[in-house]
Amino acid sequence: MVDSVGFAEAWRAQFPDSEPPRMELRSVGDIEQELERCKASIRRLEQEVNQERFRMIYLQTLLAKEKKSYDRQRWGFRRAAQPPDGAAEPRASAPRPPPAPADGADPAPVEESEARPDGEGSPSKGRSASARRPAAAASADRDDRGPPTSVAALRSNFEKIRKGPAQPGSADAEKPFYVNVEFHHERGLVKVNDKEVSDRISSLGSQAMQMERKKSQQSAGQGLGEAPRPHYRGRSSESSCGLDGDYEDAELNPRFLKDNLINANGGNRPPWPPLEYQPYQSIYVGGMMVEGEGKSPLLRSQSTSEQEKRLTWPRRSYSPRSFEDSGGGYTPDCSSNENLTSSEEDFSSGQSSRVSPSPTTYRMFRDKSRSPSQNSQQSFDSSSPPTPQCQKRHRQCQVVVSEATIVGVRKTGQIWPSDGDSTFQGEADSSFGTPPGYGCAADQAEEQRRHQDGLPYIDDSPSSSPHLSSKGRGSLASGALDPTKVSELDLEKGLEMRKWVLSGILASEETYLSHLEALLLPMKPLKAAATTSQPVLTSQQIETIFFKVPELYEIHKEFYDGLFPRVQQWSHQQRVGDLFQKLASQLGVYRAFVDNYGVAMETAEKCCQANAQFAEISENLRARSNKDVKDSTTKNSLETLLYKPVDRVTRSTLVLHDLLKHTPSSHPDHSLLQDALRISQNFLSSINEEITPRRQSMTVKKGEHRQLLKDSFMVELVEGARKLRHIFLFTDLLLCTKLKKQSGGKTQQYDCKWYIPLTDLSFQMVDELEALPNIPLVPDEELDALKIKISQIKSDIQREKRANKGSKVMERLRKKLSEQESLLLLMSPSMAFRVHSRNGKSYTFLISSDYERAEWRESIREQQKKCFKSFSLTSVELQMLTNSCVKLQTVHHIPLTINKEDDESPGLYGFLHVIVHSATGFKQSSNLYCTLEVDSFGYFVNKAKTRVYRDTTEPNWNEEFEIELEGSQTLRILCYEKCYNKMKMTKEDGESADKLMGKGQVQLDPQTLQDRDWQRTVIDMNGIEVKLSVKFTSREFSLKRMPSRKQTGVFGVKIAVVTKRERSKVPYIVRQCVEEIERRGMEEVGIYRVSGVATDIQALKAAFDVNNKDVSVMMSEMDVNAIAGTLKLYFRELPEPLFTDEFYPNFAEGIALSDPVAKESCMLNLLLSLPEANLLTFLFLLDHLKRVAEKETVNKMSLHNLATVFGPTLLRPSEKESKLPANPSQPITMTDSWSLEVMSQVQVLLYFLQLEAIPAPDSKRQSILFSTEV
């Protein structure tokens, strides 16, 4: 007998109220039989549940019909006007549900005969608005004219059968009742209330269905299965009934309402121009129509003034994916019904709960909607009738309509506040004569909309930008629209600025149109290929990927064509507001595009993976970059171009803010632009209400959300190897992921490496560190070699840009640069950040900045206060969470300079002088010091440290530091308390034992710092304030060696002059500084690298210049770093470098030789050729630096570190003007060549430091022998 281990225990744990079933499982055959019985039972129970649900929904709808007030607000309707007493008769018969389907068979599709997309019958076949429904006799006459040729005609005949002999004008005319009808995909209507229809009706239906199939075969888009996709909509070629050919029933054709009810001013509207393509169709649902005497059902109680009232309609769900069997139909949406049980909610999750755009007219006509966040039953998101939908089952439903409506509003968020008056708010837009826009909304069920999660967050604030873009946009003042501010400006200047703003908008529109053209370019050949035997993509895929792109192009082309001549013929009274207002009114097309964006990206990715030809096409889309140059194009990917409309719609408010800022309130355009701005802002707000919670969270349990708090790239130490990771901090866990390698056309994907619930996470303390491995440090020589390569590649890229050579060379260089920068980012960090899990596992990250490490610690600890329970994720949950990271991430690129946009600031190159004055705000006396960090090559580096100010709450350091900047944009300052008591140490992560008291940062703005004056600033650190002064000197000015004006001094005087005056071989200042450093500075950490106090250095400089006899006493009392700084300053201020201007180019060429023998001969020959004073001083310093490097284990100064510090100081030539670029607007070229030169200087000095023996100066004559070897 097979042992069913653990089944009974698991059953009781899951179902404590019932005993586990007994199963006799003696063999594999018994198990299979039991499994089949279980499956059969499930099928039977599912059928019974579905039947009962159908009955429940039917009873709900019937109850809603009988009780007109039942759940009215959830349906989204206003109160229906009640018919006069006696005007209605009881219905002849109650509706019945269709017979239950047989086991295993699909149920017959059930719809009302009217429930067809209006695009599937000819709209022109219905009567025009002027023709009201005649008496029944007239309808009978119409039957004799021949077979009907459209669904509308078929519907009219069915209405006649349904109504019987009732006269339309009589007060007791029978109301339309609800019937059960059955459709056949070939014969049309076949049953009414379970009774077979007559042969005549059946033949009419067969003819109508044949006509629909013929039309659907000619249409561009094809639906799923046998269902025709919505096709071209406009005037039918068979039409003989006027221009518009509207249906006679208002419910069946929204345009009937638009043209006949909404024309508030009584004028005739121009005919709609035909749309090229309309993917969504209005579908008649059926409804409770109240007929009056001689009036159309919807107009019975409406007076002339009532026609102007804004009208409402229930939200409808149109899912292109649900039209599988019956060729389309209304699919009720129950995903947001709050009164369903949990099982009902499961049942209501069908295909149509996905994105279902519905038709809409002008967004101007929309009524006030409600935000889904309000969870109100009056929300339009909850307004669907409580009817289930199923993949292959279409149910009838009832709609109680109180007033005529324009269209179903499928949207959340407020378009504009309703003021409650009865005036029609769409008049300003009624003269445009453009077809209706389209709006679409998203259902709230997250699991049904995973394909929509790819949408970036859209911020409607004027100073913000979407997710993917890191470009800074100038923020606009909040009072930009204040007329008092505008009035203060010079009117003439403001109007002139208005023209320039419009010119900028024109240029932007031109670029945007070129991007849309680039998208449309491959669409036509792809569509043509779709009909061949070897299609690249199917028609459905093409429609999904390029959805709404043609409409967007037409909208913006019309806008551009209207704006261009007005700007060309400019005057201060020129009006453009109507164009912007019209553009804003068509934002509904963007709504449809944005809602489809996630599906389009997902489809494109799948197509790229499945078809190499399409992958190639999607990576090489050409957009015109210059209108004046024919062949000037730029290459873009499909992903980039598809994001352009999303990015574009977020900027709609920005241009309007700019335009309004320079438009006087008295100008005719002002009110129109304000209206356009209001529409745009409300549109973006409505999108935000839906996207924000979806983007920032991932559903954990019902009512709970896991939100992303912080993420960044880090280096993880895994068994001694460095690995690049992307770390995500959620509200309840820390997730470590690895970015997968990307191939052409693919989007980012992550692999989960590990996760720790925040309740299980801790930071390691000092007593736990003994068993932890040491951090493998990368030698500085390797890091500098990487920097040399990076600088060389950047220089090559700049040269290629100037030469305008082929893009292949540029792409190859960019790839090499990315690889080298990634390697540098991986090798540079050395500061440990360790996290420990309760299960005993530890993980180590390497960070280059203590500031960043402190930020992560603070964020994790703050969130841990809100977490109380541990948990574990299933593999499916973990995979879903990892997949969501692609959409949720805020850091999209590895922090490399290659990822910077061309218009981003390259940062500052030069020297930053910083004075750390004082700090206030400490609550108790402490031993305090500060450190300074700046960013370089994409990561932050610690550059300087103040002395410790003991036992004080208000330290006054007043220390000055000179920090070299290499593309730096940010200065960070961190304030610590020095811990001398070992019992007090926390020593987290095995690093500094000192306590971080506060941290802050200041942006290094090139505009502010260019004047080379001191800038005072105060940095706030949560109550602690640190006062700083900063001054920047660019490399252009720091390159020059300035000779001293007085020849009696030491600084700035030629070394030969000083040694001759002192009658010594080595200058006194060099000997004194070296002796003092060797006496007490050999074990000083960072000697020569840590900056000394600037005031002490200046004091020593002055003492040496005046030949003060007490200088040795002064030095003994000063910090050793100040003495080291004085020695460096002396060599830096020599009017000619120690290696002389004459020999510097030869040294640079000699170090580049590849043959080691030739290199040694050349370098020694050049060295021994230096003037005697220069040579002896250099050899004296060289011996000292070698002795410093011998203490490397203590002072952390290797030969390479020393070469980095002294290389530029000893070799940098005095005259550099000829090598500087003439155009200062090319900072990258200058800084790259500078970096290469600095690296070369470092290499020259490092070569001599690494030589074991150098010939004595008195062997100078041997240079002849060396030269012969070369």
Curated annotation (Swiss-Prot):
Modified residues (Phosphothreonine): T387, T640, T692
Species classification: Eukaryota, Metazoa, Chordata, Craniata, Vertebrata
Modified residues (Phosphoserine): S122, S139, S203, S216, S237, S358, S379, S384, S461, S465, S475, S487, S1263
Gene3D superfamilies in alphabetical order: Bcr-Abl oncoprotein oligomerisation domain, C2 domain, Dbl homology (DH) domain, Pleckstrin-homology domain (PH domain)/Phosphotyrosine-binding domain (PTB), Rho GTPase activation protein
Name this polypeptide is given: Breakpoint cluster region protein
Provenance organism: Mus musculus (Mouse)
Annotated ranges, domain C2: 892-1019
Region spans: Disordered: 67-173, 201-249, 295-396, 412-481
Tissue: Expressed in brain. In hippocampal subregions, most abundant in the CA1 region and expressed at successively lower levels in the dentate gyrus and the CA3 region.
Modified residues (Phosphotyrosine): Y178, Y247, Y553, Y643
Residues at the site labelled Arginine finger: R1089
Catalytically driven reaction(s): L-seryl-[protein] + ATP = O-phospho-L-seryl-[protein] + ADP + H(+); L-threonyl-[protein] + ATP = O-phospho-L-threonyl-[protein] + ADP + H(+)
Superkingdom, natural source: Eukaryota
Note on domains (UniProt): The DH domain is involved in interaction with CCPG1.
Modified residues (N-acetylmethionine): M1
Residue numbers carrying Omega-N-methylarginine: R473
UniProt xrefs under InterPro entries: Abr/Bcr, Bcr-Abl_oncoprot_oligo, Bcr-Abl_oncoprot_oligo_sf, C2_dom, C2_domain_sf, DBL_dom_sf, DH_dom, GDS_CDC24_CS
PANTHER family assigned: BREAKPOINT CLUSTER REGION PROTEIN, BREAKPOINT CLUSTER REGION PROTEIN BCR
Region (Kinase): 1-428
Family annotation (PROSITE patterns): C2, DH_1, DH_2, PH_DOMAIN, RHOGAP
